[in-house]
Structures are given as C-alpha cells and as structure tokens.
C-alpha cells in the first residue's frame, strides 16, 4: 500500500486554477501594455463605465461642433473675400465715372463702360462662388447656382424671355413718349406758353414740379394736379438775361430744372436753353414755346433717358422666382398708361435663381457651435448691396453713345452721375461694408467657440485618459510581479509533484 503525500492532492487540485487565473491576468496586463487601454469593453471598466460613456459622448459632441466650425470658417473666409473684392470693384467704378471721362468712339462705348462690363462679369463669378459643391450666395438652396449668365441677363435667352436691354428699351419708350417730350404736352397761344402732364395721370416720363421766373415779365402759373400743368404769360417784354425755370420730377426719383434765358432780338443761340425776344409779347411767347419744346426734347433724350435705364435696371434686378421683374405693359410702350406689372418666368429672364425668402440672408445657413448657439453664415446674391452694383454695372455695359448723336455726351454724363451716386450706397441702402461686417462678426463667433471647445476637449480628453488608459510603468511592474509569482508557482508545483513519504522522510 502506497501512502500519498499529506495535502498534495488538495494542492494539485487548486494549483491549475490558480495558474490559469494568473496566466489570464498576465495576458490582460500584456494587452494593457500594448494598447495602453484599461479594458476592451465598457463592461470591463466596472463602475467607471458610466464616467467613460459620459466623457466620450461630450467629446463626440465637441468634435461635431468643431468640424462644423471648420467648414463654416472656410465658407465665411471665401464669402468675405468675394464681398471685399466686389466692394473694390464698385469703388473703382465710382472713380472711373468721374467727370470728363466721355470720349466719342466708333463703338459708342467709353473705356469706363468696357471696364464696367468686365466688372459685371467678375461680380457674377464672385456671387457664384462655391465650396465643396455648396454655393455660398444662394441662400437655403445651396445646391443651385444663384445667377444666370451675363449674356442671358443682358440679351435674354433667345426663346422669348426678355433680358435687361429689352426692358430698358421698353421703359425708355414709355418715359419719352411718342413725341419725345417725356409725356408732357406743350402749347399755348398769343402771349401764353403752356406745359402739362399727360391725361390721364400715369407714372411715366416727366412730372411738372413747379416753375419760377426772375422777372415779372414772365409770369408762371403752376397747378399741382395730378395731372399738373403750367401756364407762362409774357406780361411784358423781358430784358436780356431774364430767366424762366421749370422744375421736373423724373421716374428714378431725381429732379432736373430747365433754365430758359431771354436773349436779344436778332441774336442766335441754342433753342434748348434760350429764346429770342421778339417784336412784341406775342412773338416773344412764340419763341418761348419753341424753346420749351426744344428744352424738353433735349432733357428727355438725356437725363430722362438715363433715368429710364435706372428704373428698368432696378426693376430687373429686384426680380426673383417668387417676384418676377416689373415691366411696362405693351406694346405699344410709348403710349402706355397702366402701371408696370410683373412679368412671368416665361417672358422675362429671372437673373437670380436662389432662395429669396423674407428671412435675413445670414440666417439661411447656420453653424451650431454650442448647445444653444447658432451662428449665421449665409448670404444671397440678390441682397440689396449686390443688386445696386449689378444694376449700375449693367446700365453702363448696355448703353451706347454714338459719336454722331449730339446728345451723347449729355446723356453719358447723366448716366455716370447716377451710377456714381448709386455706387456710393448712400441713405438707407445696404452697403457692401455691412455684409462684410456681419460675415466678420460670424467669423469672430466661430473663432471664440473653437477656442472654448478646444480647451474643453483637452480637459475632457485628459479626464478620459485617467479612466480608460493605464500607465506603462505601473503595468510593467505588475507584469514582472506576476511573472515572478508564476515562476515560483511552477517551481513549487514541480517539487510537490515529485514529493512522496519516502522522499519526505
């Protein structure tokens, strides 16, 4: 009979389990040393799993905000650069249109007009800027190119939809009228000269606004109406140099004044600004009537023509998909009396194809930078500041001033004066600088949010590392301890496996 070593059976039964457990612990420590991760799953973190989940969720949210901020910042920088370039183009045009820039040419166009055409095209390119397939000036419809082509805007599409050139011609016909006197009628008899607004009253052409005389010899009587009328009586022979002044309101909101000066009998001078003193008051009145007609004709061909272009261009660029441009009813246009009515997408080019809602342009695209903070980064190509510039560039590009036309220089100067005034963005008109400021403010908001979130991310990342990560040094020490323990266990097990009572004794 063989007597087993005391307790060796119990030890052998327990030792394998302990060795397996220790070996498993060693394997896990080796994994921790390789990955620097405390656990492979949230469940293995024990009570720290809630902390880990919370920190990871917060970091994910911060990453989402930071990614949006990065994209938004790129969009804002490109949009801001586009608006700044546009502002420079408008300033250059103001300088180009200063006085004494008219030079007759075989093409009927001056150098500033050619430059304005190029600026118009460049502005369209700026407004069609896109980043990663997103158009920056299309409002909420970021997948739609906001403007049509230069050719389509100016000339129409060739299939019956009118462009700006046609709309300007229609408006000019309506303003000048069949007689070319700005829809005013002239007349009188004996010692009287008369001017009157057309009947029935309408919104085209000149509107009489008043009259004054430097002498009692010329007595004006003005009736405001509408329709307004003016009667001038030659009460006695005027002296050389006496003047009659007639004030006219134009459809673009400007005012002009006709000044007619009496000149000595037998002398010559332009009928559009002077009249000859006749043999008697009746003859003088007849000369005055002829001078009034000539002056109105010249004013209609120059300042009124320039005003017509402004009105038509403003109406054209105010048009959008939901609100097509206003057009003069017709043909015929030169006798039109009905107010301008909206065209349709079938007969009029709609230059702007983007979103044209009533909400603020900046709100059409937003970046969420915090739980309750949205930063507006949107823009629309049909914002007032852009419409004004496009209209002025287009007017200069469309107009022609033949060298053979005696009124070309006066009409050119009337055009450039209006272009320069409009491009000053005076009064309550939106200015490019306002858009630049708003986009700059949005950039500042994004930068501050980014700085704040990066600071928070660094703190949370450090906190998460304390929960999920391990120290290589500590793990290495634990591994050495376990290796020593395993080695001792293996040696002890080996010795005990050979132990018998005989060996023990």
Question: Where is each model-derived feature located?
Answer:
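Charged, amphipathic alpha-helical segments
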Residues: 210-235
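Polar, low-complexity export/assembly segments characteristic of proteins
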Residues: 26, 30-33, 37, 140-212, ...
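N-terminal start-of-chain detector that recognizes signal peptides
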Residues: 4-6, 11-12, 107-110, 216-217, ...
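Amphipathic alpha-helical polymerization modules
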Residues: 1-152, 402-505
């Amino acid at each position: 009979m063989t007597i087993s070593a005391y307790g060796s059976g119990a030890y052998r039964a327990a030792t394998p389990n302990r060795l397996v457990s220790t070996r498993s612990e060693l394997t896990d420590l080796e994994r921790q040393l390789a990955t620097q991760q405390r656990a492979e799953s949230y469940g293995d973190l024990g009570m720290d799993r809630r902390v880990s989940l919370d920190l990871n969720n917060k970091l994910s949210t911060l990453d989402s905000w930071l990614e949006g901020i990065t994209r938004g910042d790129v969009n804002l920088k490109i949009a801001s650069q586009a608006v700044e370039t546009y502002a420079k183009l408008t300033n250059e045009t103001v300088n180009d249109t200063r006085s004494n820039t008219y030079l007759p040419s075989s093409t009927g166009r001056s150098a500033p007009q050619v430059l304005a055409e190029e600026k118009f095209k460049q502005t369209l390119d700026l407004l069609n800027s896109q980043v990663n397939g997103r158009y920056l000036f299309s409002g909420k419809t970021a997948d739609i190119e906001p403007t049509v082509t230069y050719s389509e805007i100016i000339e129409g599409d060739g299939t019956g939809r009118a462009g700006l050139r046609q709309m300007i011609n229609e408006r000019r016909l309506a303003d000048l009228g069949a007689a070319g006197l700005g829809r005013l009628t002239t007349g009188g008899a004996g010692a009287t000269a008369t001017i009157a607004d057309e009947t029935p009253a309408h919104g085209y052409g000149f509107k009489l606004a008043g009259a004054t005389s430097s002498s009692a010899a010329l007595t004006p009587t003005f009736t405001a109406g509408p329709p307004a009328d003016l009667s001038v009586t030659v009460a006695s022979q005027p002296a050389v140099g006496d003047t009659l002044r007639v004030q006219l309101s134009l459809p673009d909101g400007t005012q002009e004044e006709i000044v007619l000066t009496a000149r000595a009998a037998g002398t010559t001078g332009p009928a559009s600004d002077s009249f000859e003193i006749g043999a008697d008051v009746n003859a003088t009145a007849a000369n005055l009537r002829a001078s009034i007609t000539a002056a109105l004709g010249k004013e209609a061909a120059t300042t009124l023509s320039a005003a017509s272009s402004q009105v038509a261009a403003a109406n054209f660029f105010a048009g959008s998909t939901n609100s097509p441009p206003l057009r003069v009813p017709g043909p015929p246009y030169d006798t039109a009396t009905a107010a301008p009515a909206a065209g349709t997408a079938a007969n009029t080019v709609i230059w702007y194809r983007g979103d044209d809602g009533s909400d603020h342009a900046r709100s059409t695209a937003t970046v969420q930078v915090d739980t309750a903070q949205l930063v507006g980064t949107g823009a629309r190509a049909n914002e007032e500041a852009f419409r004004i510039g496009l209209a002025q560039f287009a007017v200069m590009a469309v107009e022609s001033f033949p060298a053979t036309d005696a009124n070309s220089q006066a009409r050119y100067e009337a055009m450039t004066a209006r272009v320069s005034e409009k491009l000053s963005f005076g009064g309550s008109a939106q200015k490019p600088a306002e858009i630049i400021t708003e986009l700059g403010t949005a950039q500042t908001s994004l930068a501050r949010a980014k700085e704040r979130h990066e600071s928070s991310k660094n703190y949370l990342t450090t906190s998460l590392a304390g929960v999920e990560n391990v120290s290589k040094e500590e793990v290495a020490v634990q591994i050495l301890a376990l290796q020593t323990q395993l080695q001792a266990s293996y040696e002890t097990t080996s010795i005990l496996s050979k132990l018998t009572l005989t060996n023990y004794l």
